From Swiss-Prot:
GO biological process: Mo-molybdopterin cofactor biosynthetic process
GO cellular component: cytoplasm
Keywords associated with the record: Cytoplasm, Molybdenum cofactor biosynthesis
HAMAP family membership: FdhD
Source species, domain of life: Archaea
Family: Belongs to the FdhD family.
InterPro entries registered for this protein in UniProt: Cytidine_deaminase-like, FdhD
Keyword Cytoplasm annotated: yes
Entry protein name: Sulfur carrier protein FdhD
Gene expressing this chain: fdhD
Subcellular location per the Swiss-Prot or TrEMBL entry: Cytoplasm
Lineage, top ranks: Archaea, Thermoproteota, Thermoprotei, Sulfolobales, Sulfolobaceae
């Protein structure tokens, strides 16, 4: 369940009245790897398999689906993974909240150079925010979720996920690619609904995605690693304009 109805007091023009509202659900997902408690992720329930695969990929526990012997939900908020690659799993038991994308080991140690000749167009970039918004079913009811979507270079929607954490939504995108055995994904565009921080860009780069676009601003670290990795970073996509912060040669005008 991703939506919950709650009772509220609604205030308007100095008057208060009892009412109801719909809010996005946020609950903990406990991840066990090789029977060890690895992490607790605060997330919007749904697509937990994809979220877990994306998280484990970013944290360097897996490189592909071949590294996963078994993955199963033991309850609504508990998932167990058994690895085939003999990776040592330290019992860390840390909590990743909905605003923290690099609370674990993450991608701080290395940035790989992207290998992609992908190109897209000005028209495609401009069209993505509306395509993202029109497919945000839970946000349209609650106004409380971030979203990430993967598009082809011609602007066709491949997948979209919503979550209270923008990094979770990206992990779900990447986890779905792992599940479909489609990594690295070097011919697509990642579109996100909010600002573009370090964690968003680093996750996309690790998955091979060459173009990252957002409706808001990127951070300085996001720009730095996109430049170093050869990724095209686009921000403030609004109306018929946008800013290209790195590698503009991938976008034809």
């Amino acid at each position: 369940m991703q939506i919950r109805k709650v009772k509220i007091s609604k205030v308007k023009d100095g008057y208060r009245a009892s009412s109801e509202d719909f809010v996005a659900v946020e609950e903990p997902l406990q991840i066990f790897v090789n029977e060890k408690n690895l992490a607790i992720i605060m997330r919007t329930p749904g697509n937990d398999l994809e979220l877990t695969l994306g998280f484990l990929y970013y944290e360097d526990y897996i490189n592909s689906l071949r590294d996963v012997e078994e993955i199963s939900m033991l309850s609504d908020n508990e998932i167990h993974v058994r690895l085939t690659n003999g990776k040592f799993v330290e019992t860390r038991n840390f909590v990743i909240n909905s605003s923290c994308g690099i609370c674990g080991r993450g991608f701080l140690n290395a940035i790989e150079l992207l290998k992609s000749d992908a190109k897209t167009s000005n028209e495609v970039i401009i069209s993505l925010p509306e395509k993202l918004r029109s497919n945000q079913g839970v946000f349209n009811i609650t106004g409380g979720l971030h979203a990430a979507a993967l598009f082809t270079l011609s602007g066709e929607l491949i997948s979209i996920y919503e979550d209270v954490g923008r990094h979770n939504a990206v992990d779900k995108i990447i986890g779905s690619l792992i599940h479909k055995r489609r990594l690295p994904f070097t011919e697509g565009i990642l579109q996100v609904s909010g600002r573009i921080g370090y964690e968003i860009v680093s996750k996309a780069i690790k998955a091979g995605i060459p173009i990252i676009s957002g409706i808001s601003a990127p951070t300085s670290k996001a720009i730095e690693i996109a430049e170093d990795a050869g990724a095209t970073l686009v921000g403030f996509v609004r109306g018929n304009s946008f800013n290209v912060y790195t590698h503009p040669e991938r976008i034809d005008l």
